[in-house]
A protein has these predicted regions:
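N-terminal leader/linker segments that precede catalytic domains of diphosphate-processing enzymes
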Residues: 1-219
């Protein structure tokens, strides 16, 4: 809750679940949030963060597929969310899901780095898993959308910026044994239902809360 007792409005955010084929099955890339982080400190999460204004203005190398865009709804917001997922992952892990292109007139270190590579976010590589909304009693709230992509489409070397610690590839079983929150556990289950990391289809789940109890709906 906010200081007035009214629930804080959730901020739009996006996360990217990068997967690859490992020796023991599908692996996902995760990192640990810093101990002093304001939101879920010390928890292992997927790379991601809130949508920034430039995510709406950046020019992608390729658009979302029609199927993925339709599952997300509003076209402009869908693109901004997807760009944010790619940008945040690039910032936090050094891996860029990109293709040849020019990000446009947006400024900042991440965009400059993409521009130097002659690359921009390749949104066509993303599929959409689902979304989650933080409980109303939390002082920090997000409306997070979770995307999925194959790591083989990313370029770069795994090297964090320091925002996420202990970046590592783990199997789904190993990930469930890490300190994770319920939303992360749910998204891992969704990934586990996909044969060989196939693209999610059908109605996307919404993970939210009624009071402090998790509720999953398929609106």
């Amino acid at each position: 809750m906010g200081v007035t007792g009214v629930p804080v409005r959730p901020r739009d955010a996006a996360s990217l679940v990068l997967i690859r084929d490992g020796r023991r099955g599908v692996e996902v890339l995760m990192g640990r949030r810093r101990p002093k982080a304001a939101f879920i400190p010390d928890a292992y999460v997927f790379p991601g963060g809130r949508v920034e204004p430039d995510d709406r203005r950046a020019v992608p190398a390729a658009p979302l597929t029609a199927e993925t865009a339709a599952r997300l709804g509003d076209a402009a917001m869908a693109r901004a969310l997807a760009v944010a997922a790619v940008r945040e992952t690039f910032e936090e892990t050094g891996l860029l899901l990109g293709g040849a292109g020019d990000v446009g007139s947006v400024e900042g270190p991440s965009w400059a780095a993409m521009r130097a590579l002659g690359m921009a976010p390749a949104l066509n590589r993303l599929s959409y898993i689902g979304r989650a909304i933080t409980p109303t009693n939390s002082p920090i709230r997000f409306h997070a959308r979770f995307f999925l992509a194959q790591a083989r489409h990313a370029v770069g070397t795994l090297a964090g910026s320091g925002e996420l610690l202990d970046l590592r590839w783990v199997t789904l079983e190993q990930a469930r044994r890490l300190p994770i929150v319920d939303v992360t556990e749910f998204m891992l289950e969704e990934v586990g239902r996909l044969p060989g990391g196939d693209k999610p289809r059908g109605r996307a789940p919404l993970f939210s809360y009624r009071g402090n109890s998790p509720v999953v709906r398929y609106p």
